[in-house]
Amino acid sequence: MRFFAILLSLTAFVAAPVSAAASPDLVSVEQQLQSLMADKSADVGVAALDLNTGESLSIKGDTPFPMASTVKVAIAALYLSQVDHGQKTLDDTIRGESVRSLMGKMLIYSDNRAADVLFKDVGGPHAVHRWLVDNGIQGVRVDRTIAQLLADKRDLWDTRDSSTPKAMVDLLRRIYRGELISAHSRNYLLGVMAKCHTGKNRMKWLLPAGTPVEHKTGTLNGLSDDVGFITMPDGHRIAVAIFARGGANRPQTIAQAARAIYDGFKTLFSWPYRPALTTAQ
């Protein structure tokens, strides 16, 4: 069994809008995650950020992991940015099918054909990568179409089509705060992601029943990912990225990590009041 040292850090993200001191509650989450990962054969990267307060944690937060189908969040965001700029609409048709339908298939059912149709329409992998870089998203690489990704020999440590956990959470943060797409487009995107049909045994599995989750999974041989938003009981949203490669029982590991994150951030709400950050309306 290959052992991977786990580097834990509890700091504000470089790109986060606020700098928040680490609380003892999140330190305990680090310890729980450290114990959890020590018992796992998979290599796991985690990042989580309270979008209201800026409190954050990460495990291997700066290590690239293959995105698999979680790249579809970036494809959707670029298309919606083009909608916001008047270049496209969700009612446009491509190959006889509306973009709205293609978006649903791509994000809800992780349909690879629909993803590649939208990939091509926004300009391909290079266009998505360039858009992320131009908007200050560092740590994400987009190199291949989904068809190319599936056809190529798979290497769990290939840095093509990869993201660090922190970079993925930064993408989610900026989507949520309306920095990459409009509030209207953000609400549409989160509404579709809330219907995600894949990965029911991952991020959502061990959360309390009824917990709102908007997420996108990624799966390849030896890879299991889940990224998105978890809404806490008081309405705070936590942006979460969990990547797992190699080893066994990766979905269960993702579910356990998500529950530890949920419980840890929930304890923060007993602390003195922290005002919510203003988000785009």
Regions flagged by a language model, labelled:
Residues D25-G61, I230-T231:
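A short, well-structured edge-of-sheet supersecondary motif
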Residues F119-R177:
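Mid-domain, small-residue-enriched loop/turn segments at the edges of structured enzyme/sensor domains
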